[in-house]
Amino acid sequence: NSPAKFCPPPFSKVVEGLTDVHPRIWVQKSSWDKFIEQAKTKKEYQWYVKRAEKVMKVPMKGLNDINLEKLSSLENEMKRKAYITRESRRIIDAEESNGMVLVYAYLLTKNEAYAKEATKRIISMSDWNKSSSVAGDFNESTVVSLASMAYDSFYDLLTDDERKAL
């Protein structure tokens, strides 16, 4: 019992203390409805819901939408790489933002359509770094952050495969 020596409890004791429900980071399940009611009076609520509705109406842009038309006219590798980086970032940045909006809109409304669309988009984005159409800093940390936020927020809605993918 010396304060200088830490003796961790046995694993069985630690496991006993674990909750049997998924712990939430953004919104606790028990206070979610109250959170939604309080949020409805905020202008940000309307902004996120309106933006999410707009995102839902537009198909996700993908790697095939990256404009590479001018690539062949560039005379050196450095200019080509800068061009690919700039053009790929246009698509990537927009879709990262769209994914974030859908996650927030789901948390604000419990509309499962937002969660399903966000899940589909985020899983798709997670493979973009493997493409030759993407160059430069892909912001993988942003995608990981977005995926973990989606995992936490949609946990009860996700299939086992979706949980593994996120």
Regions found by a protein language model. Give the residues of each.
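Short, mixed-charge, low-aromatic patches
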Residues: 5-10, 72-80, 102
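Short, flexible helical or helix-coil boundary motifs
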Residues: 6, 42-46, 55-63, 75-78
